[in-house]
Amino acid sequence: MTAERTIARALLDGDAGLAERIGTALLKTSPCNFVERPWGGMRIRAYKRLCPLPDQPALTGAGLGEAFEISAYDADDEAREHPSRVRFEDGSSAALPALLRRHAERWLGPELAERHGGAFPLLPKTLDVRELLSVQGHPDGHTEAYVIIDAEPGATLRVGFNRDIDPTELEAALTQGRAWQQHVLELVGDRLSPARVQALVAPWLSSRQAGTADVADELWAAMPSAERALGESLLEKLKKLYWRVLDSMNAIPATPGTVIHNANPPRIAAARGRPAAAEVHALGNPEGLEFLALEIRRPGPTFRAWDNVRFPLRRIDVSAAMHVLNLRRVDPEELVTPLEPVPGHPGLFKSVRDPSFEIEHIRPSLEGTVDVPASGAHCLHCISGAATLTGADGRALGTLARGESALVPIGVGAYRVTGAEADTEVVKATPSSGA
């Protein structure tokens, strides 16, 4: 390419010959596509081998909760706001959605490109969960999987109800809880910011034994006794609801290597007579024990039913969430998914088979190799170690180190993964044929 016409520019201009060549190797995306979240942590930068930053949560009130690994689906608001970028050998770069608008048929294959209008139908993210996410659900057909990468000892995540739930009772309780939160803010007025209220209330909520006296002095300072008593009563009610909701869900250990397929078990989907959806989930735990996970999911909406008494108030939609959630009991054993060896391919394992995606795990030993058969376009995520990839004809396809991801075009075909470090693992996520 000339100085005036970079690889990125040529591809965006529709250079078919160049797209053919580029589409036979990895399309590595930027590892820094971070999004701040109030529940996020700071382990994700070290995981991605990036230099540490100051304590961002203390500065902004939010940590780096997510990294959008492969984001190229403009019909989804989040994906459109945080598109992936691909950097080429000449140093130029371009947004992946714009590249796919030009070359989706060549890189994704005609069938996938036609079904999704030139977009990639998965939205994989790396999550850094330090505090509880909201209690949430997704529409029919929208399931998720979590591959636990690293975790503090004792970390858990809530997935699925552990008992049958009365829908009318739960919806009324969550709606009332939001009204109580609003009333607390009205009582506090402008004496404290919502962020300060959160800083005071969050540790008190997470301790079952703590009484309101632990937060009362600053929250209700100089307040008339009647209003102070009302405020303390509201907080006590909110705390009971906080734990009632959490205790109604399965607390699944976030153990590194665990794979959780968050989808209605077949017995539930059959009873509902609807396509499987994700079970109710609130990733994270009240103890604040941090974990990293690779999340594989389709792009699509999230309905928050309850935000675990978080301040400032974020938007929730209790009725929409109740419409999509399965309220019947689910056992953790129906969600945790074992890895199964792929016959004839040593070092290759399969975990999740979902109507929207399939997940495989490539685990070469140090300097060992794993042969991966040809498949449709997919994404790769190196979650530990480092790997070198070569094509079936021996051509170099690229490298992946821990925390890096790539889109693998359909033209790559079969390839070999060689471990460059001990304990290397690369997760492969492929859109299912019906996705």
Specify the residue positions occupied by each region the protein language model found.
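Short acidic-glycine-tyrosine-enriched beta hairpin
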Residues: 249-261, 391-412
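Non-heme Fe(II)/2-oxoglutarate
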Residues: 266, 285-321, 376, 403
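Transition-metal
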Residues: 1-222, 300, 305-336, 359
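A short beta-loop-beta micro-motif enriched in histidine and acidic residues
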Residues: 119, 139-144, 366-379
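A cytosolic small-molecule/anion-sensing beta-strand core signal
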Residues: 383
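Ligand-binding loop in jelly-roll beta-barrel domains
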Residues: 119, 129-130, 139-141, 151-154, ...
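Functionally critical, mid-to-C-terminal surface segments that flank or help form catalytic/ligand
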Residues: 318-375
